[in-house]
UniProtKB/Swiss-Prot annotation:
Stretches with biased composition (Gly residues): 288-298
Protein name (record): Single-stranded DNA-binding protein 3
Modified sites of kind Asymmetric dimethylarginine: R128, R134, R138
Compositionally biased tracts (Low complexity): 223-241, 319-330
Domain LisH span(s) in chain numbering: 16-48
Composition bias type Pro residues, residue spans: 245-255
Protein function: May be involved in transcription regulation of the alpha 2(I) collagen gene where it binds to the single-stranded polypyrimidine sequences in the promoter region.
Source organism per UniProt: Rattus norvegicus (Rat)
Record key words, sorted: Acetylation, DNA-binding, Methylation, Nucleus, Phosphoprotein, Transcription, Transcription regulation
GO biological process, one term: head morphogenesis
Location of this chain's protein in the cell: Nucleus
Chain positions covered by the region annotation Disordered: 140-166, 184-361
């Protein structure tokens, strides 16, 4: 109502009350209520001199103008009487200078009825007020406007759907060198792509995203086919990985004796977690004459898919990798494509298998 600034005096509430009391007394005198006017002054203990204005007085004139404009508002002009000047005032004000925030919204509650879109108050609040709303943060290729649900919030470098890797492997798990002691991993580091798909749920949480391409670049079998063997790690974190020497999927990595020089780090650390308070010094899998994986010849059938127990493995006889029981192809030997459609593992109940050759769990 009053312009606030250093050069202009702002009237206090006391001055406003005095003005209003003067206008009320003036109104009562102009309408002929002299006794009411004197009683009013005595009850409010008015002691100053009063100078009356011309009739009908400021209060009456101000009220008439307000009421005319109130009745000429667009939502009431059809039901209330008003002057043409008041109607023209509303029409001109709405067409010439609409409100930048609310526009021509009817003054019900001062706010629109529907939800306010993102960034509604941003263009005119952020430059002036330091505490105004900040623009929404966009990530990646999200379009401006901050409307959720239009684009994924992850940039291209973090979007797993844009990688060539497995869908269950995040974008950050793409290029990792295989650990030492794992034997030959195929022709160099490879990503899962170009036709090579690992079976679903085959990578446990303890071995995320190791780039172990299959031997000789052969494609993985389709996990959706009916003849594929579903081998998933029933014990998380203990899956060894895909075959290293061209063997069928589901067989542990078993390097040939010629590659035993690369086994300075025991592969047992990759397939058997350390039990609480225990040790794993009794596992006979160091580099020797039978190769680093020579003691895995007599594993039980349920241990051949990488789901090893959490305890130590004791007392396994050392066999040559070429004499492994229950595997259709020894590691390093080629196989026919026709094997992909049949059963990869022979029956494990043969002469070379006995209950005494199982792992202690």
């Amino acid at each position: 109502m009053f312009a606030k600034g250093k050069g202009s005096a702002v009237p206090s509430d006391g001055q406003a009350r005095e003005k209003l009391a003067l206008y009320v007394y003036e109104y009562l005198l102009h309408v002929g209520a002299q006794k009411s006017a004197q009683t009013f002054l005595s009850e409010i203990r008015w002691e100053k001199n009063i100078t009356l204005g011309e009739p009908p007085g400021f209060l009456h004139s101000w009220w008439c103008v307000f009421w005319d404009l109130y009745c000429a508002a667009p939502e009431r002009r059809d039901t209330c009487e008003h002057s043409s000047e008041a109607k023209a005032f509303h029409d001109y004000s709405a067409a010439a200078a609409p409100s930048p925030v609310l526009g021509n919204i009817p003054p019900n509650d001062g706010m629109p009825g529907g939800p306010i879109p993102p960034g509604f108050f941003q263009p005119f609040m952020s430059p002036r007020y330091a505490g105004g709303p900040r623009p929404p943060i966009r990530m990646g290729n999200q379009p401006p406007g901050g409307v959720p649900g239009t684009q994924p919030l992850m940039p291209n470098s973090m979007d797993p759907t844009r990688q060539q890797g497995h869908p269950n492997m995040g974008g950050s798990m793409q290029r990792m060198n295989p650990p030492r002691g794992m034997g030959p991993m195929g022709p160099g580091p490879q990503n899962y792509g170009s036709g090579m798909r690992p079976p679903p749920n085959s990578l446990g949480p303890a071995m995320p995203g190791i780039n172990m391409g299959p031997g000789a670049g052969r494609p993985w079998p389709n996990p959706n086919s009916a003849n594929s063997i579903p081998y998933s790690s029933s014990s998380p974190g203990t899956y060894v990985g895909p075959p290293g020497g061209g063997g069928p999927p589901g067989t542990p990595i078993m390097p040939s004796p010629a590659d035993s020089t690369n086994s300075s780090d025991n592969i047992y650390t990759m397939i058997n977690p350390v039990p609480p308070g225990g040790s794993r010094s009794n596992f006979p899998m160091g580099p020797g004459s039978d190769g680093p994986m020579g003691g895995m010849g007599g594993m039980e059938p349920h241990h051949m898919n990488g789901s090893l127990g959490s305890g130590d493995i004791n007392g396994l006889p050392k066999n040559s990798p070429n004499n492994i029981s229950g595997i259709s192809n020894p590691p390093g030997t080629p196989r026919d494509d026709g094997e992909l459609g049949g059963n990869f593992l022979h029956s494990f109940q043969n002469d070379n298998y006995s209950p005494s050759m199982t792992m202690s769990v």
